[in-house]
Amino acid sequence: MAYWLFKSELSVWGWNDQVTKGDVGEEWDGVRNYQARNFMRDMAVGDLGFFYHSQKEKAVVGIVRVCAAAHPDSTTDDPRWECVDISAVRPFTVPVTLEMVKADERLADMALVRSSRLSVQPVTETEWEIVCGLGNTDPE
């Protein structure tokens, strides 16, 4: 299993929007960055990810599961762009803010800190466990 981070602006698509889609999930569409697209191509059904609110809140607020592998993005006719589908698993007990992540030296190399603008990012297993611990949330 691999771990990921999905960033979204709360005003565009927030955690509560994701939860309303249930186990069927929703396309993580609209990504127009080649590196982020390639990360989605690497994802497998069952992989887990952090749901991160960017902009105002800047915090990990939930855990999602990849429920459909990479496929053409339905928001464009351009075949270069693909997306995965994700479904909500559970909210974080305590949101983990970007400040908390940056303050933890163990997370200094995390993509969220190094490549903060990338909308889809890999997360190592160690980073996954640390962030879940900071949020008092079960990593499984």
Which residues does each PLM region occupy?
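Structured loops at beta-to-helix junctions and adjacent beta-edge loops in soluble globular domains
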Residues: K7-E9, V89, V123
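Aromatic- and Lys/Arg-enriched surface recognition patch
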Residues: V61-V120
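Short, charged, solvent-exposed linker or helix-capping segments at domain edges/interfaces
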Residues: D17, P95-V101, V131-L134
